[in-house]
């Protein structure tokens, strides 16, 4: 495929709008429509029904983008910048992909990729479309929105014929061919509205935002702004760069908020507009605007130029936006508002979203334009929630901003969760597999779980208060709901699509809630199964893996015995993990679930040997002995293994420590040990060879450890403990290793820290001696965990080395399946079903989780409705097709795509929807340039299809056309119900 996108002719555009709206009530995929309340805000002699809209950028480039934004609640449109370089010449300068908005935003876009003439026509088409939509669909007042031009980048270019003509025609489009065509098409479509259509104003825009390149001299900026005010008589905003804050301020703010990895130097700060030049210039321009009877203000801010250092995007420099830009932009607002006593009007762009838009508006900062937030899942639909958040606030004409409120907002931004970067690098949200051509909706949380829990389903049951059925569903795959509800590594939450909104659904906490509230109901319903007579299983080890295996086997009626050397079952969770993380009562309840199925438990002494167990009649033996052997820390001094030390601490009733304890390691166990030492009175330190960003501990556990005041010594390796000191090598980070983490390398320097005891938490090991004593060769494992000894298996830590509880459960389930000979079969309750309507209602709604409350309400139900690629495409090039059987398919519309790459970031698969989804082509040339599987309609019956065996023509009217059944159904549905996509 090509990155070239086609403007849609106005008759086709309106055919799409009217057909889609009549068919399903959507507007270019926007499900939630804002119907104005009747309130409005005056600006530029016009009125806007809401203070929000798309910033000049990917969401305001094409007519359909603007239409989609309007339907969702936008009323101030800063249309994409035009300049003298345009069309193919400009598009050739834009690399692909050019947008990266998975977290903070980056882009390598520029001005419009269309010609200036095409851009003008797009904006005129959008203007006319919004006029008729407001009237016919009741979205609001036809005069309740404003178009704001954006032009750049130098005076000669702006005064040149191309851009000058554009400005003139936007100010009065009455004589343009496009405006005349729009009126003609609308009159044919809506003859009953001919008088209204005739009255549509040709004055598309009365205002402009000036955008200049980095390094533009202040004199040039002032000349252009003066020209726009005096000669063009346009209300004018001048867009400013964050570089006006100065290098030290920008660097300090970003570093303090966790963005220290973002690289930039001082050259833009030195070359861009300086504060001492800016203030007097803005004062002069403000006076000039007053003299002209116009409004003047500042657009804060432009995106922020940073270096591409990690292959984020193709070019060497990219432009930062979104949540990391907000603290810089609001500090710019703070300084401007104080300097001008609140009298300088500010148009905001720079990380605005649902969580801060009301505060900006209350402080007198508006209009507020957005880009990054509506490039994420939810897309344009996010605008309605923003609008609803402010529509009950007073709507007043601008009389000044509130410097005190802005100052408070700038200060709070530095500590706001929504703008702080996570301590550790974000995990990949993607599955390892390729997106299917068809039927691709999936719940990434389920795919991220080693046991593939039915997460959306049990969350829905919890949401409905059906905790008993929820817990039963959980325990179909998870034998340890209390343990995993408390200490699970919850990889599911790392995959959750809600992370692209604000934070993951609290899956683990909701599981625990289901366990606590549904426990009695579940226990009362469990029944002993019919016993299996030809199998008998011995499980050596009563930790999580052993308990889980016994549960799964007992449920199937397999006689099972657990042999545990300790006096209680529970393994590491009971004997090592501190009580402030998990209680014995929680472990006991999981054990009780297992015992309900008649599992025999033998405690307090070592298990018989494998040979003895076989003689006792056991047909299958599972070694679930864990990894208790301490990892080796080869240094001199007072060094203790973390497992044994933690066991001793947990046995003591009121342990008391003193002195300095240094924990070497950075996993969850290391965090536990440091917190225990700190709580018992010692000075606790964690020593790690790398930095916090690369620590293997869960971020939540790491943050708790930080919050409790444990000291961290990063980039250090222990050498020797002696006389209350620990000698350390100072490390530096080298090249990444196989794990992707940068390897620690000795710097040649050493230092000491206080240390009376070293606790080694560097990774426990399997007890190879125990295995060898039973003839088990650890390096010779057969399929499905079977060892070299027939009938003997290893699972959990004994199989994997130190692993997570849920990985042990996965091993246990697989072992039970081997023993029983078939997978466990179960039904999902009908009450767990979610309607398409309910799933769609959650789209674009941002909300934080409430503590101690079921978080099922926030689940996006991705397996019912995903559509991330649809939401995140600014051009609406990914479209949902509703099939006759009620299922949904995604079709990619080639003519509307410029290969920005944004959809790739949010697809839960390791795929690019713009390349990997079934594609609808507009012309044969487009199809020939592409490698996508897809279709070209040559007429109503003849199609050209590219699929696995190449490109072929097919006759849809033929009964034996050899089309794959699924593709034929999709193609016929597109032809019969969605022909507006290609006509």
Residue spans of the language-model regions?
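N-terminal capping/small domains of soluble enzymes
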Residues: 1-226, 231
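Glycine/Thr-rich beta-alpha phosphate-binding loop at enzyme active sites
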Residues: 23-37, 242-342, 377-395, 637
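Catalytic cores of alpha/beta
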Residues: 64-67, 352-368
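Glycine-rich phosphate-binding active-site loops on the catalytic face of alpha/beta enzymes
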Residues: 75-85, 242, 359-386
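Ferredoxin-type iron-sulfur electron-transfer modules and their immediate structural context
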Residues: 317, 323, 328, 374-375, ...
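Flanking helices and flexible, charged tails adjoining ferredoxin-like Fe-S electron-transfer domains
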Residues: 406, 422, 432-435, 505-507, ...
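Beta1-alpha1 glycine-rich phosphate/pyrophosphate-binding loop at the start
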Residues: 453-463, 471-472, 500, 504-508, ...
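A Rossmann-like FAD-binding core segment of flavoenzymes
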Residues: 583-633, 638, 642-657, 679-778
